């Protein structure tokens, strides 16, 4: 989940964040400012370690890290049509690609990299950056709203199917085919997100009062939650916990809501044979005769837990993560702060603020800490083939303007392994087939 801050408050270049995003498994936070970008590790409550920082690219408004790998994707306001992919631990640029209009958002998993423009979406194979598909003539999407499942075995993509209604197009990023269309809301979409396995999709409209969860790939509604009654609420972020038990939503208000996804059952338990039980059963039966909007409201679940922010109106994003073996709610704001809360997974209620970190200072820089936590492994054959030397870089062939990509270097295979034991497994991650010469890549369009 990524957010681009609105107007920075007065106070200098680093007075606020231009953008901020949690990585796919909520173990890292990336921030962008007018001065550059930074990456932070989220392994501790008491200490926020800066993994990397760069001032080489100014005025950053998109920064995305691929899990806990060395790959980071950056877009700057100085070149808003150009995407840059870096290997930050080696201090090298892997590739850069230019597109026909400004880049609004980027999503990535270990299989696909998506570049979203206002009226098109480009789907790349992340391992060699070959353009696989260009979705043209999609409804205008001025905010670049889209979601990509982090489960690379399906790589589902979701994006708005209409500018005026809450229709969602579900697309399979592996088979490159449209799966279904979901009529999620009456109003325009404000947020969409997948759970970790790609089996559920949550959405909210611009009104921001109702959040719905659908099954994937059939698009059936599973849950409906009511965030509140206040109108004109802007949902800033919507995210599942990694185990899909919870769904949290932050907005431009001072409250973050956490909903619990209870087990869906086909039959309701019998009410107790008491007067109150009988009246409850009659009340639920009566909702069948009420107008649809009223009946739906009666069946909507309320928040399981909430967190109070000491601000409102600021751009922010939230996530649910397990840090030091306990569930935590994390909220990053455009003012340059990260708030950490404890979440009670059994009883819910009010989340307790336990730590506030500044994201604007120099912080504790530990460039090699993540490497120290992993066993030392030899470089894979795929990496050796892909990068014979720093001065002799293989390139992806150029594409037309519709294809968007102008040039780039093949990405080392070992960056996409799911864990240390697989980094040099050529059966699971075979060597990259290098693209040489001026041969054009075939571009599929729809």
Swiss-Prot record:
A Pfam entry, by short name: PROPPIN
The keyword Disulfide bond is assigned to this record: no
Gene Ontology biological process terms in this record: autophagosome assembly; autophagy; autophagy of mitochondrion; cellular response to starvation; glycophagy; nucleophagy; pexophagy; positive regulation of autophagosome assembly
GO molecular function (one): nuclear estrogen receptor binding
Top-level taxonomic group: Eukaryota
Principal cellular location given in the protein's record: Golgi
Effect of residue 226 to A: Loss of binding to phosphoinositides and abolishes puncta formation
Compartment annotation: Golgi apparatus, trans-Golgi network; Endosome; Cytoplasmic vesicle, Clathrin-coated vesicle; Preautophagosomal structure membrane
Region span, Disordered: 386-406
GO cellular component, as recorded: autophagosome membrane; clathrin-coated vesicle; cytoplasm; cytoskeleton; cytosol; endosome membrane; Golgi membrane; phagophore assembly site
Motif Nuclear receptor interaction mapped to chain: 131-136
Motif (L/FRRG motif): 225-228
Tissue/organ expression: Ubiquitously expressed. Highly expressed in skeletal muscle, heart, testis, pancreas and placenta. Highly expressed in G361, Sk-mel-28, Sk-mel-13, WM852 and WM451 cells. Up-regulated in a variety of tumor tissues.
Stated role: Component of the autophagy machinery that controls the major intracellular degradation process by which cytoplasmic materials are packaged into autophagosomes and delivered to lysosomes for degradation. Plays an important role in starvation- and calcium-mediated autophagy, as well as in mitophagy. Functions downstream of the ULK1 and PI3-kinases that produce phosphatidylinositol 3-phosphate (PtdIns3P) on membranes of the endoplasmic reticulum once activated.
Family: Belongs to the WD repeat PROPPIN family.
Subunit structure: Interacts with androgen receptor (AR) and the estrogen receptors ESR1 and ESR2. Interacts with WIPI2. Interacts with WDR45. Interacts with ATG16L1. May interact with NUDC.
UniProt protein name: WD repeat domain phosphoinositide-interacting protein 1
Organism annotation: Homo sapiens (Human)
Source organism phylogeny: Eukaryota, Metazoa, Chordata, Craniata, Vertebrata
């Amino acid at each position: 989940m990524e957010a681009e801050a609105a107007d920075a408050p007065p106070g200098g270049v680093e007075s606020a964040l231009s953008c901020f995003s949690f990585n796919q498994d909520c173990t890292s936070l990336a921030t962008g400012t007018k001065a550059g970008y930074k990456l932070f590790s989220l392994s501790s409550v008491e200490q926020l370690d800066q993994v990397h920082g760069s001032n080489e690219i100014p005025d950053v408004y998109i920064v995305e890290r691929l899990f806990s790998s060395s790959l980071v994707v950056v877009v700057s306001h100085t070149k808003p049509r150009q995407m840059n992919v870096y290997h930050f631990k080696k201090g090298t640029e892997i590739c850069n690609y230019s597109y026909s209009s400004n880049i609004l958002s980027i999503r990535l998993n270990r299989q696909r990299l998506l570049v979203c423009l206002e009226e098109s979406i480009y789907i790349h194979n992340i391992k060699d950056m070959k353009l696989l598909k260009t979705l043209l003539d999609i409804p205008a999407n001025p905010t670049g709203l889209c979601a990509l499942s982090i489960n690379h075995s399906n790589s589902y993509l979701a994006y708005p199917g209409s500018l005026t209604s809450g229709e969602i197009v579900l697309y399979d990023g592996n088979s490159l085919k449209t799966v279904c269309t979901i009529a999620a809301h009456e109003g325009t979409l404000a947020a969409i997100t997948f759970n970790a396995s790609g089996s559920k999709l949550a959405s909210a409209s611009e009104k921001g009062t109702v959040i719905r969860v659908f099954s994937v790939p059939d698009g059936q509604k599973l849950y409906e939650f009511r965030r509140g009654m206040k109108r004109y609420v802007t949902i800033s972020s919507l995210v599942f916990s990694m185990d899909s038990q919870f769904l949290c939503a932050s907005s431009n208000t001072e409250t973050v809501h956490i909903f619990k996804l209870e087990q869906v059952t086909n039959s309701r338990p019998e009410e107790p044979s008491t007067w109150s039980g009988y009246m409850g059963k009659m009340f639920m039966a009566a909702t069948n005769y009420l107008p649809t909007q009223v009946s739906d409201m009666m069946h909507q679940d309320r928040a399981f837990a909430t967190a109070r922010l000491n601000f409102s109106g600021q751009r922010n994003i939230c996530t649910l993560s397990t840090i030091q073996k306990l569930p935590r709610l994390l909220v990053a704001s455009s003012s340059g702060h990260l708030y950490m809360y404890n979440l009670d997974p059994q009883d819910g209620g009010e989340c307790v603020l336990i730590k506030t970190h500044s994201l604007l200072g120099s912080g504790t820089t530990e460039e090699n800490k993540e490497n120290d936590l992993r066993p030392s492994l030899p470089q894979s054959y795929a990496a050796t083939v892909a990068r014979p030397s720093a001065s002799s870089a293989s390139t992806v062939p150029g594409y037309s303007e519709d294809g968007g990509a102008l040039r780039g270097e093949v990405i080392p295979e070992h960056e996409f392994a799911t864990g240390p034991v697989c980094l040099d497994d050529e059966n699971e991650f075979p060597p990259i087939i290098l693209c040489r010469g001026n041969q054009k890549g075939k571009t599929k369009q729809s």
